[in-house]
Design a protein with these regions (language model features):
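Secretory targeting signals
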Residues: 1-30
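Terminal transmembrane helical anchor/hairpin motif
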Residues: 36-105
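Membrane-interfacial segments
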Residues: 29, 33, 50-58, 105-113, ...
Length: 170
């Protein structure tokens, strides 16, 4: 049951992130059709960034950045039955960024342009987005995994860890 639970958790986190994109697209566009097209386009780009043919064709630094931005690379582990804290942080921050942008867009329509309240809103939304980006970047250094596969297939055993620790660095 472990891999199935991990896949459901992964699907829920993926849906949460993509719903955030959809809410932002709805807040930006005036028409439902335009919002749908914009949301699908952004989601397509987020999915495209995780595809191997695109990553392989890019220079190594850009390929790493694209892989970290793409939703597929973060969903793959959960599809195998491993819930990684870095992937959960990615999906939560993805939803948070787009929901903050949607909040700023909707509230910005009510405020008069050029007023101090609108400037504070823009600064607040920018700080929220920057904070979520930094949390996502810092979260990539956190090592927290929950291997729900039978026999913990994707976790090193204690004997393997001892052997690897004894290997000389080259």
């Amino acid at each position: 049951w472990g891999p199935i639970v991990a896949q459901y958790v992964g699907a829920a986190l993926l849906a949460l992130g993509l719903v955030g994109v959809g809410v932002w697209a709805s807040s930006v566009a005036r028409s439902q059709i335009t919002a749908f097209i914009l949301g699908v386009a952004v989601m397509f780009v987020l999915i495209l960034f995780g595809l191997d043919p695109l990553i392989v064709g890019l220079p190594p630094t850009l390929g790493t950045i694209a892989a970290n931005l793409g939703v597929l690379s973060h969903f793959q582990n959960m599809g195998r039955g491993v819930i990684d804290l870095r992937d959960a942080i990615y999906f939560l921050s993805l939803a948070g960024v787009f929901l903050a942008l949607a909040y700023g867009t909707l509230l910005g329509r009510k405020l008069a342009p050029g007023r101090a309240a609108r400037r504070r809103l823009v600064v607040g939304v920018a700080l929220a987005v920057a904070t979520l980006v930094v949390v996502n970047l810092m979260g990539s250094h956190i090592n927290g995994r929950l291997d729900l596969t039978p026999g913990h297939m994707y976790t090193l055993s204690s004997g393997t860890k001892q052997i690897v620790d004894a290997l000389p660095d080259v």
